[in-house]
Amino acid sequence: MPVSRNTLQPVPDKWNAFYCRLSRDDDNEGDSNSILHQKQILERYARDHGIKQYRYYVDDGYSGTNFNRPGFKEMLADIEGGHVKAVIVKDMSRFGRNYLEVGMYTEIRFPELDVRFVAINDGVDSEDQSGNEFTPFRNIINETYP
């Protein structure tokens, strides 16, 4: 296991990616979508599911229709590098609001790379296909209702 140069602590080879995003428009809705609120939901999920190794990727002030976001790109680089075992978000709209692009990642790219995808509040978990039949419809709604 590699060691972090900054802390001399072991760095896990694989971790869970906790992704948070807040656009300027979402900010008008108050604390319900705030980055802090998203992190609280993700941390509760981690506790409830015994997840110990995770890393946050955050894009504050970026639209979900734009996938050229710094935190998102950093997460993708870590996924492509084989370091991420799961991407976990508060809900599908936090991941993105472009139906085709979201579907490309969640339905094609992540499965190709053996990366699990979880959207907590939407009940989406790529390991449990029984609850995922409405995921494409959620993506369409998220795209049309920013």
Language model segments and positions:
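Short, structured surface patches at the beginning of a domain
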Residues: 1-146
